[in-house]
């Protein structure tokens, strides 16, 4: 990728992710991102909140039934699956070695919310491919 992709996320969707991550703390929380993409800009229009069936603070696995239902719902509403998000309860907002190893879609946006500082949660977006991650430009708006 020569140029970073821009990802737009509303404050409302950020709060939705944050509330789900805080409710799941100290375990990782997870979900899917849906929206539209045009001219290198990904506009996230829906955030799905899924169950981490691993119930772990070091890794996550999305509930397969919830994942399928969320994808069906987003497609029925004319949205595309654009990626996923998960929280890091105690580590920085960047992909761990396990995140990089398990990344399955080089075209997906991977958002990571760090709750390491509970006072100032930190959300970042990445692309992961060929064993490496690249930052995406994340724009939060009202």
Cite the ranges covered by each PLM segment:
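Short, well-ordered beta-to-alpha junction loops that form the rim of enzyme active sites
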Residues: 87
